[in-house]
Swiss-Prot record:
This is ATP synthase subunit beta. GO terms for cellular component: plasma membrane; proton-transporting ATP synthase complex. It comes from the Bacteria. The gene is atpD. It comes from Rickettsia africae (strain ESF-5). Keywords: ATP synthesis, ATP-binding, Cell membrane, CF(1), Hydrogen ion transport, Ion transport, Membrane, Nucleotide-binding, Translocase, Transport. F-type ATPases have 2 components, CF(1) - the catalytic core - and CF(0) - the membrane proton channel. CF(1) has five subunits: alpha(3), beta(3), gamma(1), delta(1), epsilon(1). CF(0) has three main subunits: a(1), b(2) and c(9-12). The alpha and beta chains form an alternating ring which encloses part of the gamma chain. CF(1) is attached to CF(0) by a central stalk formed by the gamma and epsilon chains, while a peripheral stalk is formed by the delta and b chains. Its main location: membrane. Its EC number is 7.1.2.2. ATP binds at G153, G154, A155, G156, V157, G158, K159, T160. PANTHER family: ATP SYNTHASE (PTHR15184), ATP SYNTHASE SUBUNIT BETA, MITOCHONDRIAL (PTHR15184:SF71). It is found in: Cell membrane. The keyword Oxidoreductase does not apply.
């Protein structure tokens, strides 16, 4: 079979025009093209056909040093990456090349990053709780096995720390495989995560096949093409784990879905498409749907995904985070106001929700305690204007008691994290679901009305709060 060869005719930023004149065959849309810049392989993805003999492509790597006239080869297929157990313990980029300096990834399985979502008939509808060990999440917005979970928050409120703690609590205890896709985030954070995984044994450098995680990075310094496709590369590996050996349960972490949208917006602008609301690409909902519909569980295996989603200017109505909401089973909203109180994780207990907070799924006691906690916090929120203007003395005795309990609940929703031990000096806590429910049930029923507020701050179980109260006396 003769190779289809073209030549670069124009380079503008990350957009490259390639002319094919030899036999008039144009590469298909989404095909991967290859060219070489000083022996360095650069992959281009076909985005548009311009006229009869030219394609417009998006580069997956830096274009520095590339010139017009360079030969480009059509691979005849979309971007293909290695998948399967050979990827465990390794870091790769969007096109499947290793970036950890440990040699090639020798996998017999190569897969396209574009795949259809599983058929409706093959999808699973089971609902089981995934216990995270984080009180505020397990009580008020529980996660599901095989569900899609979104962590929403503005800049600097703790999305990445929360995702790292979930990796620590869930992935380490989880028997199956984990895939982490770093989409347009800080390289330093990706490096920290890699070394933490080595220290904790999730990545085994001596015997990589015993590792439990595969990492795919397309960080902030990458061109928009790479950032727009790296989530698909990570998802392709997660799908391969899900479908192997008659089904596996896979964890898929993405940090950050907003950067996927942002990169799509940059690519759209570079291709000259007319922007839609707030400057986003006109295909925003389609792009998000193509990614999210593939993150699903089948009758054989499951993908549980946890996605950090940056909220620009703390505005949840911005089109990027708003488009994500429709696809999620549970949303954990991180609030700047709660972070300002020094309560971490800064999860908003009234804004966060989950489809599985249902008495038929979580049980009557869990549901009842969660709703009582939210009721107390909502009452406190509605009384805050009166407290600010007139002071606590103007409240009725009943309202004073509600406020006192709400403040204790607020503090008890905080928790020291394992991954933050180096910053806080406090040992991390994993709290079982039964202990979480029992602790909050006692609080709303008034069992601990005599304990000081400070006793509930940054502790694990209610027993630790009682012990702390003894030391405060």
């Amino acid at each position: 079979m003769t190779k289809n060869i073209g030549k670069i005719t124009q380079i503008i930023s990350a957009v490259v025009d390639v002319k094919f004149t030899n036999n008039g065959e144009l590469p298909e849309i989404l095909n991967a093209l290859e060219c070489y810049n000083d022996k360095h392989r650069i992959v281009l993805e076909v985005a548009q056909h311009i006229g009869d003999d030219t394609v417009r492509c998006i580069a997956m790597d830096s274009m520095e040093g590339l010139v017009r006239g360079v030969e480009v080869i059509d691979t005849g297929s979309p971007i293909r990456i290695p998948v399967g157990t050979e990827t465990l313990g390794r870091i790769m980029n969007v096109v499947g090349e290793p970036i950890d300096g440990k040699g090639d990834i020798k996998s017999s399985n190569i897969s396209s990053i574009y795949k259809p979502a599983p058929d409706f008939t093959n999808q699973s509808t089971e609902r089981n709780i995934l216990v995270t060990g984080i009180k505020v999440i397990d009580l008020l917005a529980p996660y599901t096995k095989g569900g899609k979970i979104g962590l929403f928050g503005g800049a600097g409120v703790g999305k990445t720390v929360l995702i790292m703690e979930l990796i620590n609590n869930v992935a380490k205890a989880h028997g199956g495989y984990t895939v982490f896709a770093g989409v347009g985030e800080r390289t330093r954070e990706g490096n920290d995560l890699y070394h933490e995984m080595i220290d904790s044994g999730v990545i085994n450098l001596a015997e990589p096949e015993k590792s439990k995680v595969a990492l795919v990075y397309g960080q902030m310094n990458e061109p928009p093409g790479a950032r727009a496709r790296v989530a698909l590369s990570g998802l392709t590996i997660a799908e391969s784990f899900r479908d192997m050996n008659e089904g596996q349960d896979v964890l898929f972490f993405v940090d950050n879905i907003f950067r996927f949208t942002q990169a799509g917006s940059e690519v759209s602008a570079l291709l000259g498409r007319i922007p839609s609301a707030v400057g986003y690409q006109p295909t925003l909902a389609t792009d998000m749907g193509e990614l999210q519909e593939r993150i699903t569980s089948t009758k054989y295996g499951s993908i549980t995904s946890v996605q950090a989603i940056y909220v620009p200017a703390d505005d949840l109505t911005d089109p990027a985070p708003a488009t994500s909401f429709a696809h999620l089973d549970a949303t954990t909203v991180l609030s700047r106001q709660i972070a300002e109180f020094g309560i971490y994780p800064a999860v908003d207990p009234l804004d966060s929700n989950s489809q599985v907070l249902d008495p038929m799924i979580v049980g009557e006691e869990h549901y009842s305690v969660a709703r009582q906690v939210q009721q107390v916090l909502q009452t406190y929120k509605s009384l805050q204007d009166i407290i600010t203007i007139l002071g606590m003395d103007e409240l009725s005795e009943e309202d004073k008691l509600t406020v006192a309990r709400a403040r204790k609940i607020q503090r008890f929703l905080s928790q020291p994290f394992h991954v933050a031990e180096v910053f806080t000096g406090a040992a991390g806590k994993f709290v079982n679901l039964a202990d979480t429910i029992a602790g909050f049930k006692g609080l709303v029923e008034g069992k601990y009305d005599d304990l000081p507020e400070a006793a509930f701050y940054m502790v694990g179980t209610i027993d630790e709060a009682i012990e702390k109260a003894q030391t405060l006396k």
